[in-house]
């Protein structure tokens, strides 16, 4: 049995979980999320405990077992505490500023680059070179942060670009000059 999948999920106080057939809905103080569970996997709710089980040991069932348990646990974490990714901008003249709910970047291109926040995502600019992406859906927060990082990936020679906070960039040695 899956080591992750067999762990029960405890539902904290203030979180409402509904299981309607194959749809699991989680509602908390920050919002509501739902997930459709794949067909061989079953989810059972007992008071404040969610258990995820599988009917057999086929490869597909085994792989979906731990995944489903983790996705539901992430939904519960999202509606209680939420998720946040912090980004840093490194480079001369590289900066970000908030324009309403959008972000406008100066990244060394001939034009400013603007990014709008999708539903459920909020941006916070903590300075001209620091920003954070937050929301209740872990996958969506990570995807938006990755798309922002993709605007100007960190350069392996000088380290300039957009990086996650705490990310270590593997630096390359430049060519040996005479």
Swiss-Prot record:
One of its GO terms (cellular component) is cytosolic large ribosomal subunit. GO terms for molecular function: rRNA binding; structural constituent of ribosome. The keyword rRNA-binding applies. GO terms for biological process: cytoplasmic translation. PROSITE patterns: RIBOSOMAL_L6_1. It comes from the Bacteria. Keywords: Ribonucleoprotein, Ribosomal protein, RNA-binding, rRNA-binding. Gene3D superfamilies: Ribosomal protein L6, alpha-beta domain. The keyword Ribosomal protein applies. NCBIfam families: L6_bact. This protein binds to the 23S rRNA, and is important in its secondary structure. It is located near the subunit interface in the base of the L7/L12 stalk, and near the tRNA binding site of the peptidyltransferase center. Part of the 50S ribosomal subunit. PANTHER family: 60S/50S RIBOSOMAL PROTEIN L6/L9 (PTHR11655), LARGE RIBOSOMAL SUBUNIT PROTEIN UL6M (PTHR11655:SF14). Belongs to the universal ribosomal protein uL6 family. This is Large ribosomal subunit protein uL6. It comes from Pseudarthrobacter chlorophenolicus (strain ATCC 700700 / DSM 12829 / CIP 107037 / JCM 12360 / KCTC 9906 / NCIMB 13794 / A6) (Arthrobacter chlorophenolicus). The lineage of its organism: Bacteria, Bacillati, Actinomycetota, Actinomycetes, Micrococcales.
